[in-house]
Amino acid sequence: MNNLQHTLRASLVFGGGGALLLLLFFIHIGQGQANISYSMIIDALISPNQSLEHQTLIMLRLPRAVIAILAGGALAASGVILQTLTKNPLAESSTMGIHSGAYFFLVAATIFLPKGLQINSLLFTFIGGAITALFVYRISGEKKGTPLRMALAGMVVTLMLSAFTGTMQLFYENETAGLFLWGAGSLIQNNWDGVQFSFPFIIISFLVLLGISRKLNILLLGDDVAVSLGEKTAVTRLIAFIAAIFLTAVIVTVVGPIGFVGLVAPHLMRLIGYRQHFTLLLSSFLWGAVLLLGADVAGRLIDPTGAELPVGAVTAMIGSPWLIYLVYRMMKSKQYMNDNGANTAGASSRYYSYKKVIIISITLCIVTIALGVTIGSNAYIESITNVISGQLTQFDKNMMMNLRLPRMLVAAIAGACLAISGLVFQGILRNPLADPSIIGISSGAGVGALTIMYVFPTLPGFFLPIGAFIGGLLAVGIVLFFSWKSGFSPTALALIGIGISALGSAIIQIFIVKANLNVAAALTWLSGSTYARGWNHLENIILYPSLILVLIIFFLIKQLDVLVLGDDLATGLGQPVNKTRLALIVLATLLASVNIAAVGTIAFLGLVAPHLARIVVGMNHQRLFVCSALFGAILLSIADLLGRTIAYPKEIPSGLVVAVLGAPYFLWLMRKSGKKVN
């Protein structure tokens, strides 16, 4: 590249970026419910006075715009460093779980250490982010882990920590009031305190990174070359790691977790041609500021009525497609696609008697439902003895038959259906990581159901499954389209699905804010809950559609025994591969969507139950169908019972209980499959 090209590129990146940032800055401070002209804005900037308009601008709008610039730049710089240290082009604070770790620690401190929070909040977020980053790096295989595997581990850790955080928010609703909007990333500032707090930390950390930029360039040559040149690679990595995590911690402390800025901005600069860290850091800082300020402008343009859209949701809507695009590009490189699609995870060399497994499972399912019906929220043993002795009042009978029994049946049937859906997808895609939540169906169905509720609020409740099905089918269609090129690689498919899930979650957050939905109720539904589910839910939403779908899938499920052998062999045996796969995809999506509409988004159930079934009874899909359904029913019934009783009088959504148990299993499964590959 000659000098003229260098000059043109610098003019475009820094001159054009600076001009765009200035334009967005003036648009941003002109937005708001109070109508302030641009002439008044200029007057307030030059010679401010005590008028309401000037004070609104100086104390509310300007701090918000400045913190957007600082936060965007800091997150972009952090993304550059994380991508360099991990040699992972997908690395960023959100994809590595750093945001969720920092946010989890901060919420915990808000609840349990409120007096020390004001002083130590930055310390809590830094420790949480650092621990999470190291954990993700470890679980993904460290230096042997592929970029896709590392990003997938970060996303799953995010889901797990979000489950813990959501549980705490539901338990301590008063203590965490207002954290929902902030937890989604909010730039709202009521004064200059946030800017004054974050500015010195951001500038010092950024200057440190600029100071070691040459050493970071040498790191890209490899440790052997760097050591031969006299560089202390361990010291450089440690300084860069601390600075990157610290930048993220500062931002989470002030404005909450805002994802994908550190992914998009550095990649834009690399696409333009910047590779040296000094210019890469400077340009990424500038364009990270442009991206976040622009996202906040866009969020306020979407709803100019004054209802705050979390800027984190807007950046997720921008960044999720970018993540999918990057994964799609990386599929061209075989080094990222080194995990095969064989669906043997969970297979064992020793299986148990099928009849004994069925008898034990049915017994356990009945016992679990019976316990759920007889035990109240406080789990008194007297409840059981009263049932056995027949000493029940009319109130007790009504409580058991009209409240607890339908709720437990909803949990059992929904658990069975989600497990069957997961089994079908694992068989169709020959992918041990397939699950309605992992491949995007859960969030897609949630968007579809909320769209019906928001756009058509007067429609009867039985239209919810229709909206959920359309949303779920659209989500799985997008995931399958983009992952087809990789041969439905387990890691790539799961990561694209999680990208779709992030996009769906952002849309759901926007729906919640715009529709003024009850935050606690929304959190409960999004976490997955059978709370207040009665006979009408069982009959109209779950039982009839699910029963029909389950019967159809049962008669088709045997086809999976042939499909898992490979398309060529299945075709040679006379199997209509494409028709069978399409039919099962539609049926499994519809089955999952119907139940998600009833009980909310429950993650990992469709992953865990089929794997447990495979361990017990082997690879025969008709046997797996029955066992997966029973295991799913047992798991969600137990989760519902535990959620009602272990923290009385509070109630934990059953979906959170399943997520807390399922996410570690997913990470173990991914770690195990990674060892086989390596």
From Swiss-Prot:
Keywords: Cell membrane, Ion transport, Iron, Iron transport, Membrane, Transmembrane, Transmembrane helix, Transport. One of its GO terms (molecular function) is transmembrane transporter activity. The chain crosses the membrane at residues 10-30, 65-85, 94-114, 116-136, 151-171, 192-212, 238-258, 278-298, 307-327, 357-377, 409-429, 438-458, 462-482, 493-513, 517-534, 537-557, 584-604, 623-643, 650-670. InterPro entries: ABC_BtuC-like, ABC_transptr_permease_BtuC. Its main location: membrane. The keyword Magnesium does not apply. GO terms for biological process: siderophore-dependent iron import into cell. It is a multi-pass membrane protein. One of its GO terms (cellular component) is plasma membrane. CDD domains: TM_ABC_iron-siderophores_like. It is found in: Cell membrane. Belongs to the binding-protein-dependent transport system permease family. FecCD subfamily. Part of an ABC transporter complex involved in ferric-petrobactin uptake. Probably responsible for the translocation of the substrate across the membrane. The complex is composed of two ATP-binding proteins (FpuC or FpuD), two transmembrane proteins (FpuB) and a solute-binding protein (FpuA). PANTHER family: FERRIC ENTEROBACTIN TRANSPORT SYSTEM PERMEASE PROTEIN, FERRIC ENTEROBACTIN TRANSPORT SYSTEM PERMEASE PROTEIN FEPG. This is Petrobactin import system permease protein FpuB. It comes from Bacillus anthracis. The gene is fpuB.
